[in-house]
């Protein structure tokens, strides 16, 4: 059998290479547990050297792997790019009569279709998932100041007004607190007190007419007309349960407090918004556009002064006002002081040493302090020093004559055992003599010091005993 070349499983020219990377934090599926956290990123097949050479032609000299050419496009008229191309090709078929016909030829699609979940999302959010979860720093204007103070440990817990009583729940449910809250309400004028015994306006909370007489006098119950109740609210996110629950006095009081709280954030005047961008299309023959133009011309006509209504006196007044404005215009002129100018001779004199003698300023030496002996009270280094006595000179000569050359501690290469033994013995004797000499020197210096101290004490006593006549 002839050898047939096997078709490769993957064709390198038509193959697409992907990189397995982590999903972006701005991807909406980053927080989805069911979606894979790693996606496929198509690899760029373009030659790096060729791309960098083309970038240098356009003036881009950055030495990195980023493709800056993707932000460039050719100058010219805009053209329409079709969203999808047809996968069918046409081939020409010639009949026996010589007629040519085009017949569509279907091209098979890709053999492998990857799901969209393995790729990154087409749309990304402006803020990533980690930045959303980052802690908020700085001023929190949307929080209660008392809560912010408590979090920052600036809340005064010792103030009696900031402390709750043990029975604060009973105090909140008491009749006195409800009555005082109703008296302080600014919207009490919108309600009408109705006697419970009246037949015309006797309604219960459900809106039905009550035929029973609940009592008269001090125990009579006050109710309000439903038609006069303000039903408009600033809240738009009521739950399903709150819309059907019967509003008792506590819930009504809570609603009123929320209404009062949100009244503080109402805008008295709502004007035009800044930097408003309007997009859209309006016909030039539109009636709305004509109304806007007419309103503009009417407003301009009101602001301008017509010639028939302008008198000569008015014209003179306007001229005089313009003259006064011209006279009143004042300009502030800053006059700078003239700088000192140097001529050629003066500036050259600073470079010569004819009149300029630069030198280093020396620090004068400090005066030497007089040191006084603690024992004698006499200034030191004043009396002349005494020389050595005959006994001291004899001792020094004996010490100098007793000096012997030191024995070498380094052995020779050709040293025998007897020589080494003799050398070690000599070293021991030398060290012994040195110790004896050192001890004798210490004793001699100690005796000399004690003798000098005694002489100084005697000298001090003799000086104090002198009497000047």
Curated annotation (Swiss-Prot):
<dbReference type="InterPro" id="IPR007307">
    <property type="entry name" value="Ltv1"/>
</dbReference>
<feature type="region of interest" description="Disordered">
    <location>
        <begin position="399"/>
        <end position="453"/>
    </location>
</feature>
<feature type="compositionally biased region" description="Acidic residues">
    <location>
        <begin position="185"/>
        <end position="217"/>
    </location>
</feature>
<dbReference type="Pfam" id="PF04180">
    <property type="entry name" value="LTV"/>
</dbReference>
<dbReference type="GO" id="GO:0042254">
    <property type="term" value="P:ribosome biogenesis"/>
</dbReference>
<feature type="compositionally biased region" description="Polar residues">
    <location>
        <begin position="83"/>
        <end position="93"/>
    </location>
</feature>
<dbReference type="GO" id="GO:0030688">
    <property type="term" value="C:preribosome, small subunit precursor"/>
</dbReference>
<dbReference type="GO" id="GO:0000056">
    <property type="term" value="P:ribosomal small subunit export from nucleus"/>
</dbReference>
<feature type="coiled-coil region">
    <location>
        <begin position="412"/>
        <end position="467"/>
    </location>
</feature>
<comment type="function">
    <text>Essential for ribosome biogenesis.</text>
</comment>
<feature type="compositionally biased region" description="Basic and acidic residues">
    <location>
        <begin position="175"/>
        <end position="184"/>
    </location>
</feature>
<dbReference type="GO" id="GO:0042274">
    <property type="term" value="P:ribosomal small subunit biogenesis"/>
</dbReference>
<dbReference type="GO" id="GO:0005634">
    <property type="term" value="C:nucleus"/>
</dbReference>
<dbReference type="GO" id="GO:0005829">
    <property type="term" value="C:cytosol"/>
</dbReference>
<feature type="region of interest" description="Disordered">
    <location>
        <begin position="175"/>
        <end position="220"/>
    </location>
</feature>
<protein>
    <recommendedName>
        <fullName>Protein LTV1 homolog</fullName>
    </recommendedName>
</protein>
<feature type="compositionally biased region" description="Basic and acidic residues">
    <location>
        <begin position="411"/>
        <end position="453"/>
    </location>
</feature>
<keyword id="KW-0175">Coiled coil</keyword>
<comment type="similarity">
    <text>Belongs to the LTV1 family.</text>
</comment>
<feature type="region of interest" description="Disordered">
    <location>
        <begin position="77"/>
        <end position="113"/>
    </location>
</feature>
<keyword id="KW-0690">Ribosome biogenesis</keyword>
<feature type="region of interest" description="Disordered">
    <location>
        <begin position="24"/>
        <end position="53"/>
    </location>
</feature>
<feature type="compositionally biased region" description="Basic and acidic residues">
    <location>
        <begin position="44"/>
        <end position="53"/>
    </location>
</feature>
């Amino acid at each position: 059998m002839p050898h047939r070349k096997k078709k490769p499983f993957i064709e390198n020219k038509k193959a697409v290479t992907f990189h397995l990377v982590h999903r972006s934090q701005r991807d909406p599926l980053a927080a989805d547990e069911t979606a894979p956290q790693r996606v496929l990123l198509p690899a760029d097949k373009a030659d790096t050297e060729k791309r960098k050479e083309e970038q240098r032609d356009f003036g881009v000299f950055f030495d990195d792997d980023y493709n800056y050419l993707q932000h460039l496009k050719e100058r010219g008229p805009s053209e329409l790019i079709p969203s999808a191309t047809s996968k069918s090709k046409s081939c020409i078929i010639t009949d026996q009569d010589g007629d040519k016909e085009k017949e569509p030829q279907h091209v098979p699609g890709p053999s492998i279709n990857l799901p969209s979940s393995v790729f990154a999302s087409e749309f990304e959010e402006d803020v990533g998932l980690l930045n959303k979860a980052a802690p908020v720093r700085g001023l929190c204007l949307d929080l209660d100041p008392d809560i912010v103070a408590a979090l920052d440990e600036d809340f005064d817990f010792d103030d009696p007004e900031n402390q709750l009583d043990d029975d604060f729940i009973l105090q909140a449910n008491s009749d006195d607190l409800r009555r005082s809250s109703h008296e302080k309400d600014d919207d009490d004028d919108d309600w009408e007190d109705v006697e419970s015994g009246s037949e015309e306006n006797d309604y219960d909370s459900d809106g039905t007419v009550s035929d029973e007489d609940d009592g008269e006098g001090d125990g009579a119950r006050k109710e309000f007309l439903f038609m006069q109740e303000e039903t408009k609210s600033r809240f738009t996110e009521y739950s399903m349960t709150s819309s059907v629950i019967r509003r008792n006095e506590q819930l009504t009081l809570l609603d009123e407090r929320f209404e009062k709280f949100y009244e503080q954030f109402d805008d008295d005047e709502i004007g035009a918004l800044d930097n408003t961008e309007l997009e859209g299309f309006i016909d030039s023959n539109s009636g709305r556009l004509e109304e806007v133009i007419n309103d503009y011309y009417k407003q301009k006509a009101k602001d301008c002064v017509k010639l028939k209504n302008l008198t000569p006196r008015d014209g003179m007044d306007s001229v005089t006002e313009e003259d006064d404005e011209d006279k009143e215009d004042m300009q502030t002129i800053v006059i700078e002081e003239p700088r000192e100018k140097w001529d050629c001779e003066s500036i050259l004199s600073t470079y010569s040493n004819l009149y300029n003698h630069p030198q280093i300023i020396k620090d004068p030496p400090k005066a030497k302090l007089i040191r006084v002996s603690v024992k004698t009270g006499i200034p030191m280094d004043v009396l002349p020093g005494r020389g050595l006595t005959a006994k001291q000179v004899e001792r020094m000569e004996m010490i100098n004559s007793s000096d012997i050359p030191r024995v070498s501690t380094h052995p020779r290469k050709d040293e025998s055992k007897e020589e080494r033994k003799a050398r070690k013995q000599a070293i021991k004797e030398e060290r012994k003599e040195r110790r004896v000499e050192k001890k004798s020197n210490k004793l001699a210096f100690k005796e000399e010091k004690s003798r000098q101290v005694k002489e100084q004490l005697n000298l001090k006593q003799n000086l104090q005993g002198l009497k000047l006549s």
